[in-house]
Amino acid sequence: MTWIDPLGLAVDPITKLEDRGYTGVTKTSGGGLDYSNSHALYNKRPGVNPVVTIEYSGDYDIDFQRANAKAGLNQVSTPRGYVWHHLDDYDPVTNKGTMQLIEKQAHRGINHNGGVSQYKTATGIEYTHPARNSGARGCD
């Protein structure tokens, strides 16, 4: 038997994304979201790869810097209006996972499981992020 939302308040993340105009996002077998076939994926500059594999650090800012470098952005900060999404394919043996550079509006307020929650389960370590104190939120 599956859970039924008695008040009808739970919103499927794919439905929420489609309501925002983002199509092509798929649910992974682990309950995460894969943006690789969505127009939410960064495509502003030629030569930039918006899907990269990095070694997880336990710190959002460090992960974002690593992903920026690996993507070929040649900058420390993530492009304005975009955020790096930790796909839910974290490998505890290699400590690596896939990052996808997507529009913030396709990530903000969309509940999903991601590589960060897999990292926490595998290591027992919480991810850190200075912006979290100001209300920003990364992947779980």
Tell where the protein language model's regions lie, with residue ranges.
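Nuclease and nuclease-like effector domains acting on nucleic acids or nucleotide cofactors
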Residues: 11-83, 87-140
